[in-house]
Amino acid sequence: GVVEELLFDLVADVGRYPEFLPWCRAARIRSKTDTLLVADVVIGFKGITEKFTSRVTLDRPNGIIRTAYEDGPFKYLNNHWVFEPHPDGCLIDFYVDFEFRSKMLQKIIEVFFNEAVRRMVGAFEARAHELYGPK
């Protein structure tokens, strides 16, 4: 439906993340097709700044966005979004799992992880309301 498509587009628009996502300092799209993009993202948190590269697969027919980690401070990063129709609009399954190479960074982020995810999801919700209205 229309709602899933709008929200899919919002999440797929990685280049605009710095406009609304906390801790996202910059995003540069290296290459982009209808089904794949490669992006460099700079995150800053508690005085720490890191850049990473990811390959984002856009599976629009099935409503799935998958992120594959390419390069940066992580040992691994797995992330996906699944958009499903729902009577009240759209149900979104968001999954993220990662580990930093640096033990210090990992310890810092573990303390703030739940709040960070909550704020990130809140930022996407606020952006959706800003662009598309409250429903």
Task: Give the role of each language-model region.
Residues 68-119:
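Beta-strand/loop substructures that line and gate deep hydrophobic ligand-binding cavities in soluble
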Residues 15, 113, 117, 121, ...:
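Short amphipathic alpha-helical signal-transduction/dimerization elements
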Residues 23, 50, 61, 75-77:
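Residues that act as N-cap/strand-start positions at coil-to-secondary-structure junctions
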Residues 26, 53, 78-80:
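Conserved beta-strand residues within beta-sheet cores
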Residues 1-34, 88, 123, 134:
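Hydrophobic ligand-binding cavity/cleft-lining segments
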Residues 18, 28-70, 123, 135:
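Glycine-rich portal/gate segments that line the openings of hydrophobic small-molecule binding cavities
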